[in-house]
Amino acid sequence: MRKRALISVYDKTGILDFAKFLVSKGIEIISTGGTYKYLKENNIEVIEVSKITNFEEMLDGRVKTLHPNIHGGILALRDNEEHMRTLKERNIDTIDYVIVNLYPFFEKVKEDLSFEEKIEFIDIGGPTMLRSAAKSFKNVVVISDVKDYESIKEEINKSDDVSYEARKKLAGKVFNLTSAYDAAISQFLLDEDFSEYLNISYKKFMEMRYGENSHQKAAYYTDNMTDGAMKDFKQLNGKELSYNNIRDMDLAWKVVSEFDEICCCAVKHSTPCGVALGDNVEGAYKKAYETDPVSIFGGIVAFNREVDEATAKLLNEIFLEIIIAPSFSKAALEILTKKKNIRLIECKNKPSDKKELIKVDGGILIQDTNNKLYEDLEVVTKAKPTSQEEKDLIFALKVVKFVKSNAIVVAKNLQTLGIGGGEVSRIWAAEKALERAKERFNATDVVLSSDAFFPFKDVIELAAKNGVKAIIQPSGSVNDKDSIEECDRNNISMIFSKLRHFKH
């Protein structure tokens, strides 16, 4: 019996060459709608699917292949006598190859289309044929990815057939695709914060040499439903990105995106080590570098403005893994690309995630992204912060959001002077931040931000000894009154933001 292939593709990349190959191997081709016309126009012998079903397509093409003559030919078990007798009685021929790709719902759902227009890009017949063929993979070769055409041609050329292992892998790819496709549709239609089932749709963006450590395998997947900052970036120079690079890039970009003003942020091991605002990019970088010129070595530097020539010259003086910015001037690129390995990343999108996911053993935690800065700002002390201190406090509060808890940030003139994070005790985080500020700058009249409340007045006492003049913290401790009184004793102003920023 002559073999048959059913072809129905939206993405017609490579399909002419593949169809010609199948014909050359004596395989009869059946096709639908636009694919049929495309093959016919290119002089490929093809049978319209309606000749097989004896039923014209209807409802603007919504119903074409949903027919027993198609799915019977796909799903019948060739080694089951009853199945084959049924096909013969009903004059149904088997189908041996199913080549189908889907309407581009992933892409169209992000476009500026009406709800009704997006609905029309939900494929019904395509996934149904793919799933039928994948279930019957022992008998049917199912191809859902244009990148598989060449490998299948090689298999057929070698043995006039496709191996069991290849068929099984192709079937797995189908269910991988259709589950992601259905997950995207579910997200689109439900539009719920926390639905009964968590269906997320991601696609592999790149393989990685390894994960956080060299013995860990890793890959990077991007969200099919959104164009996030870490999806739509462009690498202009340097080695391939690593797992740790992307983690650090994500944090650095989120920090600089927090500010409308010109901002520079240096990151090491997913922790900000220097953040500053400036009148220009060069000035912002100098201030961020000054915070911690040791930790920045081998780190990542992010900007929310174009990197210019003057800044590029300074950046080229030290070893950096990555520089990420919305753009680079021509002169800056000429300077920075002299170092072949430094990764230059052009990123224009603002962070857009509405949810954060954390994998735990046996489950996933999901929460809203921490996009809120404060609930209310209330000065609770006798002393009031100056206008500059208020600006510095808000600056420090924006930074402390991105430091692992317990977190303290000391700042002055829109520049971090000391960052203390990842400590199990708040006083230890304060000691670290204040010590760094004193060692590097010997600064006085500084401000201090805390990601959570002070359980005791000890942080206030330490702050008073180290030149702190203004503090911002969420409040909520049973000992808030003690902290206020200690501030009053030391003429320190304090603002309650009434919103905690734990980061684990």
From Swiss-Prot:
SUPFAM superfamilies: Cytidine deaminase-like (SSF53927), Methylglyoxal synthase-like (SSF52335). GO terms for biological process: 'de novo' IMP biosynthetic process. Keywords: Hydrolase, Multifunctional enzyme, Purine biosynthesis, Transferase. Residues 1-144 form the MGS-like domain. The keyword Transferase applies. The keyword Transcription regulation does not apply. Disulfide bonds: none annotated. One of its GO terms (cellular component) is cytosol. It catalyses: (6R)-10-formyltetrahydrofolate + 5-amino-1-(5-phospho-beta-D-ribosyl)imidazole-4-carboxamide = 5-formamido-1-(5-phospho-D-ribosyl)imidazole-4-carboxamide + (6S)-5,6,7,8-tetrahydrofolate; IMP + H2O = 5-formamido-1-(5-phospho-D-ribosyl)imidazole-4-carboxamide. Pfam families: AICARFT_IMPCHas, MGS. Pathway: Purine metabolism; IMP biosynthesis via de novo pathway; 5-formamido-1-(5-phospho-D-ribosyl)imidazole-4-carboxamide from 5-amino-1-(5-phospho-D-ribosyl)imidazole-4-carboxamide (10-formyl THF route): step 1/1; Purine metabolism; IMP biosynthesis via de novo pathway; IMP from 5-formamido-1-(5-phospho-D-ribosyl)imidazole-4-carboxamide: step 1/1. Its EC number is 2.1.2.3, 3.5.4.10. InterPro entries: AICAR_Tfase_dup_dom_sf (IPR024051), Cytidine_deaminase-like (IPR016193), MGS-like_dom (IPR011607), MGS-like_dom_sf (IPR036914), PurH-like (IPR002695). GO terms for molecular function: IMP cyclohydrolase activity; phosphoribosylaminoimidazolecarboxamide formyltransferase activity. The IMP cyclohydrolase activity resides in the N-terminal region. NCBIfam families: PRK00881.1, purH. PANTHER family: BIFUNCTIONAL PURINE BIOSYNTHESIS PROTEIN ATIC, BIFUNCTIONAL PURINE BIOSYNTHESIS PROTEIN PURH. Belongs to the PurH family. This is Bifunctional purine biosynthesis protein PurH.
